């Protein structure tokens, strides 16, 4: 863990270390937790619905945050229903439906993930649970 790096990541979100977690909104707490996770320099970072609770500027900051952390030595695994929030930072997709791998492939720049998902799931029953 690097406190200096955490400060750098927090600055991406316009935040500092001197905050009280209990006084923060869900979106603000997520920014703190993501900054902490990045500052640990973990090679695999799992994120479940990371843009949930973020406002529109926060979602842009999140994309900048991910771009800042991308390296050949780090993998981000993002589970989300909000594909528009993250499609510009993805280069690979693993689409799983009820334990079945539907797609596992590199993405071309500019891929519309909603259209990609619809094409991948064509003819399949879409589960909402």
Residue positions per predicted region:
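Hydrophobic anchor residue at the start of the ABC signature
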Residues: 34
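H-loop/switch region of ABC-family ATPase nucleotide-binding domains
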Residues: 80-81
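Catalytic Walker B motif of ABC-type/P-loop ATPase nucleotide-binding domains
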Residues: 45-49
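Helical segment within the ABC ATPase nucleotide-binding domain
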Residues: 60-72
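ABC-family P-loop ATPase nucleotide-binding domains
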Residues: 1-26
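Helix N-cap at the start of a conserved alpha-helix in ABC-type nucleotide-binding domains
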Residues: 56-58
């Amino acid at each position: 863990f690097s406190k200096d790096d955490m400060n750098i990541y927090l600055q991406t979100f316009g935040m500092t270390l001197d905050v009280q977690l209990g006084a923060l909104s869900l979106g603000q707490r997520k920014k703190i937790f993501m900054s902490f996770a990045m500052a640990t320099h973990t090679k695999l970072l799992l994120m479940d619905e990371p843009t949930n609770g973020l406002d529109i500027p926060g979602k842009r900051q999140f994309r900048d945050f991910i771009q800042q952390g991308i390296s050949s030595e780090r993998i981000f695994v993002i589970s989300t229903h909000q594909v528009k929030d993250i499609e510009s930072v993805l280069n690979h997709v693993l689409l799983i439906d009820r334990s079945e791998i539907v797609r596992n492939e590199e993405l071309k720049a500019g891929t519309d993930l909603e259209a990609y998902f619809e094409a991948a799931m064509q003819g399949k029953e879409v589960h909402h649970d």
